[in-house]
């Protein structure tokens, strides 16, 4: 069963509470995958102007803005969770140790602006205990993402410049 949930758009600064901020981030943490709809049209059907939140239509900028906010949110999760995980790992509890290892391994990736899913793709995290901990941490950028180009009726074939940029 596929269930789609429309979550209101994110704006620059969401990781610091701008726009829907934390509410947006808490909603997106609960989904299994992300379909990011990207505006790839200048005007609405009939030529009506639709103001873009950033003043101009630039799908690549929009993708980068959202991805940056999601990376920052995950980095904040690590900065909050890592000190606690390191303290808990001192007890030598295997789950606590695995959690600290996962957070330590993922932090540099996020600092290099790579999503958490790249840790899986690049084999940075392979240990089953670490994979379980990773799943439980709820990182947004660990989720698969699909970019969906929102085009106007004249560009359903995807030949327009804005679509091609995506």
Per-range role (PLM):
Residues 3, 31-39, 59-85, 102-118, ...:
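Conserved beta-strand/loop subsegment of P-loop NTPase cores
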Residues 1-19, 27, 67-71, 75-76, ...:
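Conserved ASCE/P-loop NTPase catalytic core
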Residues 84-166:
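C-terminal-of-GTPase-core extension/linker across diverse P-loop GTPases
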Residues 52-53, 74, 156:
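A short, ordered amphipathic alpha-helix with a cationic face
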Residues 1-33, 41-67, 122-137, 162-163:
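Switch II of P-loop NTPase G domains
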Residues 37, 47-48, 91, 116:
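A generic "cationic amphipathic patch" detector
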């Amino acid at each position: 069963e596929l269930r789609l949930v429309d979550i209101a758009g994110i704006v620059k600064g969401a990781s610091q509470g701008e726009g829907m901020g934390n509410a947006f981030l808490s909603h997106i943490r609960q989904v299994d995958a992300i379909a990011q709809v990207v505006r790839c049209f200048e005007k609405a059907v009939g030529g009506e102007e639709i103001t873009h939140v950033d003043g101009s239509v630039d799908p690549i900028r929009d993708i980068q803005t959202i991805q940056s906010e999601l990376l920052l949110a995950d980095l904040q999760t690590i900065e909050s969770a890592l000190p606690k995980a390191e303290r808990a790992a001192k007890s030598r509890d295997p789950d606590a140790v695995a959690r600290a290892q996962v957070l330590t391994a993922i932090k540099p990736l996020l600092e290099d602006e790579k999503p958490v899913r790249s840790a899986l793709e690049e084999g940075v995290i392979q240990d089953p205990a670490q994979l379980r901990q990773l799943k439980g941490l709820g990182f947004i950028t660990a989720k698969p993402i699909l970019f969906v180009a929102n085009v106007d009726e004249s560009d359903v074939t995807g030949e327009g410049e804005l679509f091609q940029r995506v």
